[in-house]
């Protein structure tokens, strides 16, 4: 293959370059990398790491990128010297062996996409890359020039990590100036997916384009909707709609031409997967898909309800496995943006219409609430705030992304809504989870535009515009005060959540945008 000498590897055995799905399956079987399930889907275990290792992620601190990066717990700095040392170690691991090289694009927009080359010793990791990124056409492969190279030396660990001042023997390092990432010590496939997402979150804003952690779909009339939300808020479920084509389920960009998927596949959670409630995802698990960390029954079928290896069981598959997908992986500018929050305190309305300033506030807040682990006997919900609904993937300051979103909302006259997929009638333990039927009715009213004709009332403290009536939703559900029996507990809980929002937003007080958008939040 062309460009092999540029990789800096020595005494390479065979190079398996851009293998087909059938070839990859053959290698996976021959290498004993996993098991073929009853229906022909290959299944692998990712070892001790069944999720990402955010504490082991670093950026090389150097010019010019160091002046743009928001350094801290999320974006940790590493020296050029230490990067070079670990890169040499990783290259040594990848040398003197057979290697798999997979070339792919990140970004469906020809103007915005990046060409990425992945180098690994493991066939299933090449398979994962083939599923998750955009597969180049035959003619594109012949002249493929990578913008970025990922060395995945998952078999290699850094025994000197304590001496080096690092968190563990695992390392995931990005050198922006050299256009290289190096991974060591973890086999988890999601490091490659989210690693390149982090890089897109660095590159695109510098070109005045917005990278987003959201799902997207498009209606028959070409109207585009974006769904932002943290894990467990219903992003994948609600954007998978038989009446609308799926653009993508997780990572998108928004440039002057519209919205485009970064990926060519989906990475869905499998735990408790039910063919009745999520038939599209269930149907996508077939040959060419790749299962991770699932438990198999004696007949080699998947036990989706078994989380004994991890709750984070996953499947990656090419987006073509979803019948109702948008083949171009792109569409025009959004008509509607929906922020999903699973509010376990039970005080956010099922649906609220946001002003542009409120959109900035709730985007920067990135709120959801998780239900605490029952093993400690705790029934109190835990508030989670993750800027832009994906803070762990943002190399730049969150206000950079918020500012870009605000400009695009104004320019394209986009409607923005906050939808609570969490609790109603009381907090977790007292109230009930919002039914999917009621949430779908709220989403449908947003997408068909009928919510625009509603009469709205002000939801005090949060100052949110809430519809008085909405087709398909019981009217008393629309304002949380009507659903709580204990009005005193309601007022106390509402105030408590408002204070949490205010406390979290103090982190933005040192920047101009923070002081400006703060006024759109709860007012005590």
UniProtKB/Swiss-Prot annotation:
Keywords: ATP-binding, Cytoplasm, Decarboxylase, Gluconeogenesis, Lyase, Manganese, Metal-binding, Nucleotide-binding
Keyword Membrane assigned: no
Amino acids binding Mn(2+): 194, 213, 250
Catalytic activity: oxaloacetate + ATP = phosphoenolpyruvate + ADP + CO2
GO molecular function: ATP binding; metal ion binding; phosphoenolpyruvate carboxykinase (ATP) activity
Disulfide-bond pairs as recorded: none
Cofactor-binding details, from the entry: Binds 1 Mn(2+) ion per subunit.
Matching InterPro entries: PEP_carboxykinase_ATP, PEP_carboxykinase_C, PEP_carboxykinase_N, PEPCK_ATP_CS
Gene Ontology BP, a term: gluconeogenesis
EC number per UniProt: 4.1.1.49
Pathway, per record: Carbohydrate biosynthesis; gluconeogenesis
Cofactor(s) required for function per UniProt: Mn(2+)
Enzyme class per UniProt: lyase
Residues annotated as binding substrate: 52, 188, 194, 314
GO CC terms in record: cytosol
Pfam families hit by this protein: PEPCK_ATP
Transmembrane feature ranges: none
Major localization class: cytoplasm
Assigned protein family: Belongs to the phosphoenolpyruvate carboxykinase (ATP) family.
Function: Involved in the gluconeogenesis. Catalyzes the conversion of oxaloacetate (OAA) to phosphoenolpyruvate (PEP) through direct phosphoryl transfer between the nucleoside triphosphate and OAA.
Protein name stated in the entry: Phosphoenolpyruvate carboxykinase (ATP)
Organism listed in the record: Campylobacter lari (strain RM2100 / D67 / ATCC BAA-1060)
Classification lineage: Bacteria, Pseudomonadati, Campylobacterota, Epsilonproteobacteria, Campylobacterales
């Amino acid at each position: 293959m062309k460009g092999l000498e540029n990789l800096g590897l020595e005494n390479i055995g065979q190079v398996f370059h851009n293998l087909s799905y059938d070839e990859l399956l053959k290698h996976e079987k021959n290498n004993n990398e996993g098991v073929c399930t009853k229906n022909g889907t290959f299944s692998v275990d990712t070892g001790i790491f069944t999720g990402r290792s955010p504490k082991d992620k670093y950026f090389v601190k150097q010019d010019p990128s160091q002046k743009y990066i928001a350094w801290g717990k999320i974006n940790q700095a590493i020296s050029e010297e230490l990067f070079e040392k670990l890169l040499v170690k990783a290259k040594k691991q990848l040398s003197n062996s057979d290697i798999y090289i997979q070339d792919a694009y990140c970004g469906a927009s020809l103007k915005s996409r990046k060409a990425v080359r992945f180098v690994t010793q493991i066939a299933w990791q090449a398979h994962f890359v083939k599923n998750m990124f955009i597969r180049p056409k035959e003619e594109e492969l012949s002249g493929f020039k990578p913008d970025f190279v990922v060395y995945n030396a998952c078999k290699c660990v850094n025994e000197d990590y304590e001496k080096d001042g690092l968190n563990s023997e695992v390392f995931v390092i990005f050198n922006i100036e050299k256009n290289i990432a190096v991974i060591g010590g973890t086999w988890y496939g999601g490091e490659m997916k989210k690693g390149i997402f982090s890089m897109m979150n660095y590159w695109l804003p510098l070109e005045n384009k917005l990278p987003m952690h959201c799902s997207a779909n498009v209606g028959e009339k070409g109207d585009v909707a974006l769904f932002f939300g943290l894990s467990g808020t219903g992003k994948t479920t609600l954007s998978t709609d038989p009446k609308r084509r799926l653009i993508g389920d997780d990572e998108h960009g928004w440039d002057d031409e519209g919205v485009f998927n970064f990926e060519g596949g989906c990475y869905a959670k499998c735990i408790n997967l039910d063919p009745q409630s999520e038939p599209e995802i269930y149907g996508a698990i077939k040959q060419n898909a790749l299962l991770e960390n699932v438990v198999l029954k004696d007949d080699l079928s998947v036990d989706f309800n078994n989380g004994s290896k991890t709750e984070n069981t996953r499947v990656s598959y090419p987006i073509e496995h979803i019948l109702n997908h948008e083949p171009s992986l792109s569409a025009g500018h959004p008509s509607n943006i929906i922020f999903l929050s699973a509010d376990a305190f039970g005080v956010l309305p099922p649906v609220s219409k946001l002003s542009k300033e409120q959109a900035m506030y709730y985007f920067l807040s990135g709120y959801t609430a998780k239900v605490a682990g029952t093993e400690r006997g705790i029934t109190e919900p835990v508030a989670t705030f993750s800027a832009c609904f994906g803070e762990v993937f943002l190399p730049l300051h969150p206000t950079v992304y918020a500012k870009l979103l605000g400009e695009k909302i104004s320019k394209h006259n986009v409607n923005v809504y906050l939808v609570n997929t969490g609790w109603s009638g009381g907090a977790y333990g007292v109230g009930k989870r919002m039914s999917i039927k009621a949430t779908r009715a709220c989403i449908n009213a947003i997408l068909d535009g009928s919510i625009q004709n509603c009469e709205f009332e002000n939801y005090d403290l949060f100052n949110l515009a809430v519809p008085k009536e909405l087709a398909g939703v019981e009217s008393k559900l629309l304002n949380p005060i009507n659903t709580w029996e204990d009005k005193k507990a309601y007022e106390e809980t509402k105030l408590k959540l408002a204070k949490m929002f205010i406390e979290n937003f103090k982190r933005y007080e040192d920047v101009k945008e923070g002081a400006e958008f703060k006024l759109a939040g709860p007012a005590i």
